[in-house]
Swiss-Prot record:
Intramembrane sequence windows: 70-89, 184-203
Naturally occurring in which organism (per UniProt): Arabidopsis thaliana (Mouse-ear cress)
Protein name: Two-pore potassium channel 4
Keywords: Cell membrane, Ion channel, Ion transport, Membrane, Potassium, Potassium channel, Potassium transport, Transmembrane, Transmembrane helix, Transport
Lineage: Eukaryota, Viridiplantae, Streptophyta, Embryophyta, Tracheophyta
Residue ranges of the TM segments: 32-52, 93-113, 157-177, 211-231
Length: 284
């Protein structure tokens, strides 16, 4: 009878979640909130930009293709700060609306770079770490990851690869669909990815501008990621330089600088030292 009552109580009142599970759930909800808020802000921004261009089309000057494609293209070119100049406001009304569009775009871009990009990079790093931890080769794990994080040099490699992929895909598209030669294709792709946007070469077809809507957004995120990692590397170097070195650290640094020992040698010595600490001292 007592066992039945206990079973019924467990069924009616399941065990409460542990603090760790509650914390993980809270963090997960917070991350999803960031992404949802970013999508809402981007949707509101694009809606405002598209409406501005669509309702006041006659008050903009530039090359026309398709109304809605041009509207999205104008919004993304403004948001990404590329600013080709192929579509520009020509009246006081559209200039005021463009000022509002640019101002809100700067605020949202700051949120996108500081919150969303950091969150996406964290997800990417966790996914890569999961793949690395599954490998049986410990040397590969130690070479790529350290203290549960991917080494900064590998993050930079991934960021450079992402930027290179954006440049390459953009150049290929420009050569095939915009009929530019290879030099101009690479030139416009680099100018766009780096958000310089001189305006001497631009997207002029419906297909090109439709591609630019997505490509410029991804390229802006890729460049922001690269800048974040470069800034992180500079901060790390500055922090290390400001730390007061001990005599042993200086000796290890000089040996490593001269090539007499490698990073793997240092790690092996550290492991031996840690194993030595774990061995209990024998009593007398």
């Amino acid at each position: 009878m007592e066992e039945e009552n206990l079973l019924n109580e467990n069924l009616l009142h399941p065990n409460e979640s542990s603090p760790e599970e509650t914390q993980v759930t809270t963090v997960s909800k917070s991350k999803w909130t960031i992404l949802v808020l970013a999508m809402i802000l981007l949707l509101v921004y694009l809606t405002f930009g598209v409406c501005t261009y669509s309702f006041f089309r006659d008050q903009f000057s530039g090359t026309e293709t398709n109304l809605f494609v041009d509207a999205f293209y104008f919004s993304i070119v403004t948001f990404s700060t590329v600013g080709y100049g192929d579509i520009v406001p020509s009246t006081s009304t559209t200039k005021i609306l463009t000022i509002v569009l640019v101002s809100t775009g700067v605020v949202f871009l700051d949120y996108l770079l500081n919150r969303v990009v950091s969150h996406v990079l964290s997800l990417q790093e966790n996914a890569i770490l999961d793949r690395i931890n599954k490998t049986r080769n410990r040397a590969i794990r130690d070479h790529i990851a350290e203290d549960g994080k991917i080494r900064l040099k590998w993050k930079l490699c991934l960021a450079f690869c992402a930027v290179g992929l954006c440049v390459g895909s953009g150049a290929l598209f420009l050569h095939v669909f915009e009929r530019l030669d290879w030099l101009d294709s690479v030139y416009l792709s680099v100018i766009s990815v780096t958000t310089v946007g001189y305006g001497d070469k631009t997207f002029k077809t419906v297909e090109g501008r439709g591609f630019a809507v997505f490509w410029l957004l991804l390229s802006t995120i890729a460049m922001a990621t690269l800048f974040l990692y470069l800034a992180e590397m500079r901060i790390d170097r500055t922090t290390v330089m400001k730390l007061p070195p001990s005599e042993s650290e200086f000796i290890v640094f000089k040996l490593r600088e001269s090539g007499r020992i490698s990073e793997d040698d240092i790690k092996q010595i550290v492991r031996e030292f840690e194993n030595l600490e774990e061995v209990p001292s024998s009593g007398s």
